[in-house]
Amino acid sequence: ADGMEIVGEITEDTNFVYGAESVSAEKLDKLYEDKLEKVYSCNITDEAKTVESFSYKAESYPAPAVKCARPKVLIPAFPGTNCEFDSAKAVSDAGAEPEIIVIKNLTSSAIQSSVEEFATKLKIAQMVFIPGGFSGGDEPDGSGKFITAFFRNAAVKEGVTDLLENRDGLMCGICNGFQALIKLGLVPYGKIIDTDENCPTLTFNTIARHQSKIVRTRIASNKSPWLSLTNVGEVYNVPISHGEGRFLASEELIRKLAENGQIATQYVDLSGNATNDVQFNPNDSMFAIEGITSPDGRVFGKMGHSERIGSGLYKNVPGNYDIKMFEAAVKYFK
């Protein structure tokens, strides 16, 4: 245009060119990423590669015997939980009735009182949502040990069993909550069991530190009522924040889960391919697994914080963030 001076132009390649000098974007990226590598070593040296992408399309969904216009959702807030308000807002926005129950642990009597309160309110709830955080300060070795111990209490265990087996209820756990569901056996087995070395687990990220970023996840199965408003193959952005999110299980078990549609979501790269690249699969999960379900799909666990969405967030990282899992859960009861 008249009066304007052209200072640069966009080309098809990924090089930055000034005069006779040319530098690749890959080289600049490496210089940026490696700046403090000698001080805080974190880069993975293994060659990144794509892994198998699973696909399971649901033909039908389970349905509760008793319908409910505004299902009640219990949200336990354990010592170290930091997502209960985000979770309650997401639940409320979807049309359900959230109730945050603070689990007190200052004294043994306080713990017992919390157990009794939760077990009592569980009898009239339709859903349980275990939010993320750093249960017990993630010590020792994190993975939601206090949450797991709480749910193994006889009264709470009985209430959860009744919710899932007799009242067609739903459960979900995100991040720390997912860790608890895994340790309890609720995913992938659908009930509280004594887990052993043959069960799947969530362990430390390969880079041995906390990861906090936006990742991309692909719907591998929409079998779960929580995912009934999604289509297999769709990709959603999701914020993650954890140090122990690496999903591990035997390949034999993973194949069985995939065959039954229990692998819900996988980390994917910019092309939508499941990958072990740490830039996209931040914890190096086997088969890039981000979330799994119980056999019937009514219990759902995932690492990414799908409750942390809202107007005005993540403006500088474009993508679809709304997996509509809470809306889908409410729809399940209508």
Language-model-derived ranges and their functions:
Residues D2-E21, E99-N105, C199-A208, Q266:
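Beta-strand->loop->alpha-helix junctions that form or flank phosphate-binding loops
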Residues P131, S135-P225:
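Cysteine-nucleophile active-site neighborhood
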Residues A1, E9-E12, S22-V23, F78-T81, ...:
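Short, glycine-/Ser/Thr-/acidic-enriched flexible segments
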Residues Y56-S143, N153, L227-S228, E234-N237, ...:
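Extended, subdomain-level signal for the structured scaffold at the beginning of enzyme domains
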Residues A1-K72, G80:
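Intein/HINT protein-splicing elements and their conserved insertion hotspots or analogous self-processing inserts
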Residues I111-S113, F118-T120, G159-D162, D194-K334:
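Amide-donor transfer/coupling interface in amidating biosynthetic enzymes
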